[in-house]
Amino acid sequence: MFRKKYSPWIVVAVILVILAAFLWSRTAQTATVDIPAAMGESEVEFGEFAEEYANFPAGYALQVENGTDLTTDGVVFLEKANDDLYVQFTNRSQTDSEFVLKLFLDYSEVDFFIEGVSYSEYEFQLDDGVGVQIPIHLDSQIDLQTSHMLTVGVFAAPNKYASDLDLMSNSYGMVATFEIVSPSGTRTCDTQLQFEEPAKFLKSQFGGVMLNEDFSEEDTDQVLYPLKEVTLSPGEKKSFAYRLGNYSGEVLLIVLVDWKQIPLNGADYLAIENKPGYMGFGQVEITAPMEKGKYEVVAFAVDAPFTPRTADNFFSHDTAYRFTLSVE
Protein backbone atom coordinates (compact mmCIF):
# COMPACT_ATOMS: atom_id res chain seq x y z
CA MET A 1 0.00 0.00 0.00
CA PHE A 2 1.45 3.35 -1.00
CA ARG A 3 0.80 6.72 0.57
CA LYS A 4 -1.07 9.15 -1.67
CA LYS A 5 -0.05 12.80 -1.83
CA TYR A 6 -1.93 15.15 -4.15
CA SER A 7 -2.79 18.84 -3.67
CA PRO A 8 -4.81 21.08 -3.86
CA TRP A 9 -7.24 18.42 -5.10
CA ILE A 10 -6.59 15.05 -3.55
CA VAL A 11 -6.89 12.24 -6.07
CA VAL A 12 -6.66 8.53 -5.30
CA ALA A 13 -6.19 5.77 -7.86
CA VAL A 14 -8.13 2.56 -7.34
CA ILE A 15 -7.84 -1.08 -8.35
CA LEU A 16 -10.64 -1.11 -10.87
CA VAL A 17 -11.55 -4.80 -10.72
CA ILE A 18 -11.99 -4.68 -6.95
CA LEU A 19 -13.72 -1.35 -7.10
CA ALA A 20 -16.19 -2.56 -9.70
CA ALA A 21 -17.21 -5.39 -7.41
CA PHE A 22 -18.00 -2.89 -4.67
CA LEU A 23 -19.64 -0.20 -6.70
CA TRP A 24 -21.68 -1.91 -9.43
CA SER A 25 -25.31 -0.90 -9.29
CA ARG A 26 -28.41 -1.56 -11.43
CA THR A 27 -30.14 1.64 -10.35
CA ALA A 28 -27.67 4.35 -11.35
CA GLN A 29 -29.24 7.64 -12.41
CA THR A 30 -27.55 10.18 -14.66
CA ALA A 31 -26.88 13.66 -13.28
CA THR A 32 -26.79 16.36 -15.96
CA VAL A 33 -26.81 19.71 -14.12
CA ASP A 34 -23.55 21.62 -14.58
CA ILE A 35 -21.48 22.52 -11.53
CA PRO A 36 -21.43 26.35 -11.37
CA ALA A 37 -18.09 27.94 -12.15
CA ALA A 38 -18.39 30.26 -9.16
CA MET A 39 -18.85 29.12 -5.60
CA GLY A 40 -21.62 30.30 -3.34
CA GLU A 41 -24.55 28.20 -4.56
CA SER A 42 -26.90 27.03 -1.80
CA GLU A 43 -28.07 23.74 -3.35
CA VAL A 44 -26.39 20.43 -4.01
CA GLU A 45 -25.11 20.63 -7.59
CA PHE A 46 -24.15 17.80 -9.93
CA GLY A 47 -22.22 18.12 -13.16
CA GLU A 48 -20.06 16.45 -15.75
CA PHE A 49 -16.47 15.77 -14.76
CA ALA A 50 -14.31 18.87 -15.04
CA GLU A 51 -12.22 18.91 -18.20
CA GLU A 52 -9.03 19.82 -16.34
CA TYR A 53 -9.08 16.47 -14.51
CA ALA A 54 -9.63 14.34 -17.60
CA ASN A 55 -6.01 13.15 -17.62
CA PHE A 56 -5.93 12.18 -13.94
CA PRO A 57 -5.73 8.47 -13.11
CA ALA A 58 -8.97 6.63 -12.49
CA GLY A 59 -10.22 7.17 -8.96
CA TYR A 60 -11.71 10.04 -6.98
CA ALA A 61 -11.08 13.73 -6.34
CA LEU A 62 -11.95 15.50 -3.09
CA GLN A 63 -11.73 19.15 -2.05
CA VAL A 64 -13.25 21.54 0.48
CA GLU A 65 -13.66 25.27 -0.26
CA ASN A 66 -14.93 28.25 1.72
CA GLY A 67 -16.83 29.81 -1.19
CA THR A 68 -14.37 32.58 -2.01
CA ASP A 69 -10.80 31.31 -1.75
CA LEU A 70 -8.90 28.44 -3.32
CA THR A 71 -7.93 25.87 -0.71
CA THR A 72 -4.17 25.35 -0.78
CA ASP A 73 -2.50 22.40 0.95
CA GLY A 74 -5.63 21.63 2.94
CA VAL A 75 -6.00 24.97 4.77
CA VAL A 76 -9.51 26.47 4.74
CA PHE A 77 -10.00 29.95 6.19
CA LEU A 78 -13.31 30.69 7.95
CA GLU A 79 -14.46 33.62 10.03
CA LYS A 80 -16.81 31.39 12.07
CA ALA A 81 -17.03 27.63 12.44
CA ASN A 82 -20.61 27.58 11.09
CA ASP A 83 -19.80 29.54 7.92
CA ASP A 84 -20.71 27.83 4.65
CA LEU A 85 -18.32 25.24 3.28
CA TYR A 86 -18.43 23.36 -0.02
CA VAL A 87 -17.43 19.72 -0.32
CA GLN A 88 -16.46 18.91 -3.90
CA PHE A 89 -16.20 15.26 -4.87
CA THR A 90 -15.76 13.64 -8.27
CA ASN A 91 -16.20 10.02 -9.26
CA ARG A 92 -13.77 8.79 -11.92
CA SER A 93 -13.77 5.16 -10.79
CA GLN A 94 -15.26 4.05 -14.14
CA THR A 95 -18.27 2.77 -12.19
CA ASP A 96 -21.52 4.41 -11.09
CA SER A 97 -22.05 4.21 -7.34
CA GLU A 98 -23.79 5.43 -4.24
CA PHE A 99 -21.68 7.30 -1.68
CA VAL A 100 -22.03 8.47 1.91
CA LEU A 101 -20.52 11.71 3.27
CA LYS A 102 -19.27 11.79 6.88
CA LEU A 103 -17.69 14.67 8.82
CA PHE A 104 -15.46 14.67 11.88
CA LEU A 105 -14.41 17.79 13.80
CA ASP A 106 -11.15 17.33 15.67
CA TYR A 107 -11.66 13.64 14.92
CA SER A 108 -15.04 13.24 16.59
CA GLU A 109 -18.09 12.60 14.39
CA VAL A 110 -20.34 15.66 14.01
CA ASP A 111 -23.68 16.47 12.47
CA PHE A 112 -23.83 19.03 9.66
CA PHE A 113 -26.43 20.97 7.71
CA ILE A 114 -27.25 20.81 4.01
CA GLU A 115 -29.92 23.22 2.77
CA GLY A 116 -31.11 23.70 6.36
CA VAL A 117 -31.52 19.99 7.10
CA SER A 118 -29.36 18.29 9.75
CA TYR A 119 -27.49 15.11 8.80
CA SER A 120 -25.16 12.72 10.58
CA GLU A 121 -24.45 11.18 7.18
CA TYR A 122 -25.51 12.19 3.68
CA GLU A 123 -26.01 9.63 0.91
CA PHE A 124 -25.93 10.48 -2.78
CA GLN A 125 -25.55 8.71 -6.10
CA LEU A 126 -22.88 9.65 -8.62
CA ASP A 127 -22.25 8.35 -12.11
CA ASP A 128 -18.73 7.83 -13.35
CA GLY A 129 -17.28 11.08 -14.70
CA VAL A 130 -19.67 13.23 -12.65
CA GLY A 131 -18.83 15.59 -9.78
CA VAL A 132 -20.92 16.97 -6.94
CA GLN A 133 -20.65 20.16 -4.92
CA ILE A 134 -22.34 19.87 -1.51
CA PRO A 135 -22.89 23.07 0.53
CA ILE A 136 -22.54 22.32 4.23
CA HIS A 137 -22.17 24.17 7.48
CA LEU A 138 -21.25 22.87 10.88
CA ASP A 139 -23.37 23.24 13.99
CA SER A 140 -20.41 24.41 16.03
CA GLN A 141 -19.28 27.44 18.01
CA ILE A 142 -15.61 26.51 18.32
CA ASP A 143 -13.11 29.35 18.42
CA LEU A 144 -11.15 29.54 15.17
CA GLN A 145 -8.44 31.80 16.56
CA THR A 146 -6.49 28.54 16.68
CA SER A 147 -6.69 25.72 14.16
CA HIS A 148 -9.17 22.86 14.24
CA MET A 149 -9.22 19.77 12.05
CA LEU A 150 -12.13 18.87 9.78
CA THR A 151 -11.98 15.32 8.46
CA VAL A 152 -14.12 14.63 5.39
CA GLY A 153 -14.90 11.06 4.43
CA VAL A 154 -16.73 10.02 1.26
CA PHE A 155 -17.24 6.27 1.23
CA ALA A 156 -18.46 4.20 -1.72
CA ALA A 157 -21.22 1.60 -1.73
CA PRO A 158 -22.61 2.26 1.76
CA ASN A 159 -25.51 -0.15 1.14
CA LYS A 160 -23.36 -3.09 0.03
CA TYR A 161 -21.52 -5.58 2.24
CA ALA A 162 -18.08 -7.13 1.97
CA SER A 163 -19.60 -10.46 2.99
CA ASP A 164 -21.58 -10.57 -0.26
CA LEU A 165 -18.59 -9.96 -2.53
CA ASP A 166 -15.87 -12.20 -3.93
CA LEU A 167 -13.06 -9.67 -3.49
CA MET A 168 -11.98 -7.43 -0.63
CA SER A 169 -10.83 -3.85 -0.97
CA ASN A 170 -9.34 -0.96 0.95
CA SER A 171 -10.10 1.42 -1.94
CA TYR A 172 -13.71 2.41 -1.32
CA GLY A 173 -13.68 6.19 -1.24
CA MET A 174 -11.57 8.97 0.19
CA VAL A 175 -10.85 10.41 3.63
CA ALA A 176 -8.82 13.58 4.15
CA THR A 177 -8.31 16.12 6.93
CA PHE A 178 -8.51 19.87 6.31
CA GLU A 179 -7.33 22.55 8.71
CA ILE A 180 -9.93 25.26 9.44
CA VAL A 181 -8.82 28.52 11.02
CA SER A 182 -9.68 32.22 11.00
CA PRO A 183 -7.64 34.41 8.61
CA SER A 184 -6.55 36.37 11.69
CA GLY A 185 -5.97 33.25 13.79
CA THR A 186 -2.85 31.35 14.78
CA ARG A 187 -2.18 28.17 12.86
CA THR A 188 -1.59 25.86 15.78
CA CYS A 189 -3.75 23.17 17.38
CA ASP A 190 -4.48 23.53 21.07
CA THR A 191 -4.72 19.90 22.18
CA GLN A 192 -3.88 18.15 25.42
CA LEU A 193 -4.30 14.69 23.94
CA GLN A 194 -1.86 12.12 25.26
CA PHE A 195 -0.48 9.66 22.71
CA GLU A 196 0.61 6.25 23.95
CA GLU A 197 2.83 3.59 22.47
CA PRO A 198 1.01 0.53 21.11
CA ALA A 199 1.07 -2.74 23.00
CA LYS A 200 4.01 -3.85 20.88
CA PHE A 201 6.21 -2.68 18.02
CA LEU A 202 6.73 -5.28 15.30
CA LYS A 203 9.48 -5.11 12.70
CA SER A 204 7.67 -4.87 9.39
CA GLN A 205 7.73 -3.03 6.07
CA PHE A 206 3.93 -3.05 5.95
CA GLY A 207 2.56 0.44 5.44
CA GLY A 208 -1.00 1.37 6.29
CA VAL A 209 -3.72 0.16 8.63
CA MET A 210 -5.33 -3.24 9.15
CA LEU A 211 -8.06 -4.47 11.49
CA ASN A 212 -8.47 -8.25 11.78
CA GLU A 213 -8.53 -11.26 14.12
CA ASP A 214 -4.85 -12.15 13.77
CA PHE A 215 -3.33 -11.74 17.25
CA SER A 216 0.10 -13.16 16.41
CA GLU A 217 2.96 -10.88 17.43
CA GLU A 218 5.54 -12.02 14.90
CA ASP A 219 7.84 -9.69 12.99
CA THR A 220 6.63 -10.06 9.42
CA ASP A 221 5.99 -8.05 6.28
CA GLN A 222 2.89 -10.12 5.54
CA VAL A 223 -0.39 -8.95 7.05
CA LEU A 224 -3.53 -11.06 6.81
CA TYR A 225 -6.81 -9.78 5.44
CA PRO A 226 -9.72 -9.79 7.86
CA LEU A 227 -12.49 -12.33 7.41
CA LYS A 228 -15.14 -10.98 5.07
CA GLU A 229 -17.78 -11.66 7.71
CA VAL A 230 -17.65 -11.84 11.51
CA THR A 231 -20.74 -13.17 13.30
CA LEU A 232 -21.69 -11.95 16.78
CA SER A 233 -24.73 -11.98 19.05
CA PRO A 234 -26.57 -8.73 19.86
CA GLY A 235 -24.49 -6.72 22.33
CA GLU A 236 -21.59 -9.18 22.23
CA LYS A 237 -18.11 -7.71 22.71
CA LYS A 238 -15.19 -8.88 20.60
CA SER A 239 -11.53 -7.91 20.44
CA PHE A 240 -9.82 -7.17 17.14
CA ALA A 241 -6.14 -6.70 16.42
CA TYR A 242 -5.00 -3.47 14.82
CA ARG A 243 -1.80 -2.87 12.90
CA LEU A 244 -0.45 0.57 12.04
CA GLY A 245 2.53 0.28 9.73
CA ASN A 246 5.38 2.73 9.19
CA TYR A 247 3.88 5.92 10.55
CA SER A 248 6.57 8.27 11.79
CA GLY A 249 4.95 9.55 14.97
CA GLU A 250 1.48 10.45 16.18
CA VAL A 251 -1.37 8.60 14.49
CA LEU A 252 -5.08 8.18 15.23
CA LEU A 253 -7.11 5.06 14.55
CA ILE A 254 -10.81 5.68 13.86
CA VAL A 255 -13.35 2.89 13.38
CA LEU A 256 -16.89 3.09 11.98
CA VAL A 257 -19.59 0.45 12.35
CA ASP A 258 -22.61 0.98 10.09
CA TRP A 259 -20.99 4.31 9.10
CA LYS A 260 -21.03 5.58 12.70
CA GLN A 261 -17.93 6.26 14.78
CA ILE A 262 -17.55 3.87 17.69
CA PRO A 263 -15.57 4.33 20.93
CA LEU A 264 -12.20 2.62 21.14
CA ASN A 265 -10.97 1.79 24.62
CA GLY A 266 -13.17 4.53 26.07
CA ALA A 267 -12.37 7.32 23.57
CA ASP A 268 -13.58 8.39 20.12
CA TYR A 269 -10.30 7.17 18.63
CA LEU A 270 -7.09 5.43 19.54
CA ALA A 271 -4.13 7.84 19.89
CA ILE A 272 -0.88 5.99 19.15
CA GLU A 273 2.74 7.14 19.19
CA ASN A 274 4.26 5.04 16.42
CA LYS A 275 7.81 4.91 15.12
CA PRO A 276 9.14 4.56 11.57
CA GLY A 277 10.28 1.15 10.43
CA TYR A 278 7.91 -0.58 12.81
CA MET A 279 4.31 -1.67 12.85
CA GLY A 280 2.30 -0.66 15.89
CA PHE A 281 0.27 -3.61 17.18
CA GLY A 282 -2.52 -3.73 19.74
CA GLN A 283 -6.16 -4.56 20.35
CA VAL A 284 -9.47 -2.72 20.31
CA GLU A 285 -12.89 -3.94 21.39
CA ILE A 286 -16.03 -3.67 19.27
CA THR A 287 -19.52 -4.16 20.68
CA ALA A 288 -22.12 -5.61 18.33
CA PRO A 289 -25.30 -3.56 17.83
CA MET A 290 -28.38 -4.80 19.67
CA GLU A 291 -30.46 -5.10 16.50
CA LYS A 292 -29.90 -8.13 14.30
CA GLY A 293 -28.64 -7.49 10.80
CA LYS A 294 -25.51 -6.73 8.78
CA TYR A 295 -23.17 -3.84 9.58
CA GLU A 296 -20.14 -2.75 7.59
CA VAL A 297 -16.91 -2.14 9.53
CA VAL A 298 -14.39 0.36 8.17
CA ALA A 299 -11.35 2.02 9.72
CA PHE A 300 -8.85 4.69 8.78
CA ALA A 301 -5.61 6.08 10.18
CA VAL A 302 -4.75 9.78 10.48
CA ASP A 303 -1.04 10.54 10.37
CA ALA A 304 0.20 13.73 12.12
CA PRO A 305 -3.38 14.53 13.19
CA PHE A 306 -2.76 17.87 14.92
CA THR A 307 0.06 19.20 12.76
CA PRO A 308 -0.94 22.24 10.64
CA ARG A 309 -1.59 21.20 7.05
CA THR A 310 1.17 21.71 4.49
CA ALA A 311 2.13 20.19 1.16
CA ASP A 312 4.18 17.67 3.16
CA ASN A 313 1.28 16.22 5.17
CA PHE A 314 -1.89 16.98 3.19
CA PHE A 315 -2.88 13.68 1.62
CA SER A 316 -5.64 11.13 1.77
CA HIS A 317 -5.72 8.83 4.79
CA ASP A 318 -5.06 5.11 4.67
CA THR A 319 -8.18 2.96 4.98
CA ALA A 320 -8.36 -0.60 6.26
CA TYR A 321 -9.96 -3.47 4.38
CA ARG A 322 -13.64 -3.32 5.16
CA PHE A 323 -15.55 -6.32 6.47
CA THR A 324 -19.07 -7.15 7.58
CA LEU A 325 -20.32 -7.64 11.12
CA SER A 326 -23.33 -9.97 11.09
CA VAL A 327 -25.46 -9.83 14.23
CA GLU A 328 -27.60 -12.94 14.66
Where are these regions (language model features)?
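N-terminal Sec-pathway targeting helices
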Residues: 1-16
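A eukaryote-biased signal for short, well-structured alpha-helical docking elements
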Residues: 18-63, 173-212
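Beta-sheet-dominated interaction scaffolds and their linkers
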Residues: 57-82, 216-234
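Short edge beta-strand/loop segments characteristic of extracellular beta-sandwich folds
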Residues: 84-92, 239-245
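Short acidic, flexible loop segments centered on an aromatic residue
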Residues: 93-110, 244-261
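Intrinsically disordered, low-complexity Pro/Gly/Ser/Thr-rich segments with frequent PxxP/GP/PP motifs
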Residues: 115-143, 267-284
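Short glycine/proline/serine/threonine-rich loop/turn segments at secondary-structure transition edges
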Residues: 141-151, 290-298
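Short beta-strand elements
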Residues: 161-207, 305-328
